[in-house]
A protein has these predicted regions:
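Early exported N-terminus immediately downstream of N-terminal targeting peptides
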Residues: 24-104
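Surface-exposed, charged secondary-structure patches
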Residues: 102-144, 196-202
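Sec/Tat signal peptide C-region and signal peptidase I cleavage site
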Residues: 16-22
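Low-complexity, intrinsically disordered terminal/linker segments enriched in charged
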Residues: 161-202
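Short beta-strand edge/turn micro-motifs at domain boundaries
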Residues: 143-171
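Positively charged n-region of N-terminal signal peptides that target proteins for export
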Residues: 1-5
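Bacterial N-terminal signal peptides
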Residues: 7-16
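Solvent-exposed loop/turn segments at secondary-structure junctions
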Residues: 81, 98-99, 123, 137-138, ...
Length: 202
């Protein structure tokens, strides 16, 4: 599943790198430029050889700026988000972002011949919160539906969720985070995430 997500995420991210300020529908923006960037990823020898520094550079520069990590973290935390102090919310957002980047950067080296099928956008033209639907087609394997929950803020579209085969990426963490908060409080969750990320809890 991680491989399919990476193919879709990179396709999604590519559009925003080129057209961050264009007045385009989010699905049209993705479709227009994603294939070019996916081809770049496919042919990058450093990525194909598993160069983790290069992989994370791509993730951080082309993907991360196009996601609303604060909202993603709030969704993953559920009601516990409101119990966190502003400083705790900041730490949680930072650690969750790092976790996602680390988790999915490893699958980037597995990208080969996947293609992306972009579905028509079914949303009110004036809506600021839409779902962009795509399907990752993999040779010899069943296609995987990957949808992006996106919100327009200050004229810019950003994603706040990725739904793979009907399963939300961020809310999939909710039970795990809830258990950790019950066991060790919000600071305990922060410490656990920091340990996983190798950054240590300060």
């Amino acid at each position: 599943m991680r491989n399919a997500i990476c193919s879709g995420l990179l396709a999604f991210a590519a559009a925003f790198v080129v057209s961050a300020h264009a007045e385009e529908a989010p699905d049209a923006m993705v479709k227009r430029v994603s294939q070019e960037v996916l081809q770049t990823i496919k042919s990058d020898p450093k990525i194909q050889s598993g160069d983790q520094a290069r992989i994370r550079e791509v993730m951080e520069s082309k993907l991360a700026p196009n996601f609303d990590f604060e909202r993603m973290t709030a969704l993953a935390m559920g009601r516990n988000w409101r119990q966190a102090t502003p400083e705790q919310q900041k730490r949680l957002t930072t650690e969750f972002k790092t976790l996602l980047v680390r988790t999915y950067s490893g699958a980037l080296t597995q990208y080969r011949d996947q293609t992306i099928d972009y579905k028509p956008l079914r949303a009110d033209p004036n809506s600021s919160d839409v779902m962009v639907r795509t399907e990752v087609v993999r040779q010899g394997q069943p296609p995987v539906q990957i949808d992006y929950g996106m919100e327009k803020k200050d004229g810019t579209w950003k994603a706040y969720d990725v739904v793979v085969g009907g399963v939300s990426l961020v809310t999939n963490y909710r039970d795990e985070f809830g258990e950790q908060v019950r066991a060790g409080g919000i600071d305990g969750l922060i410490k656990t995430l920091a340990t996983k990320n190798g950054s240590g809890a300060k």
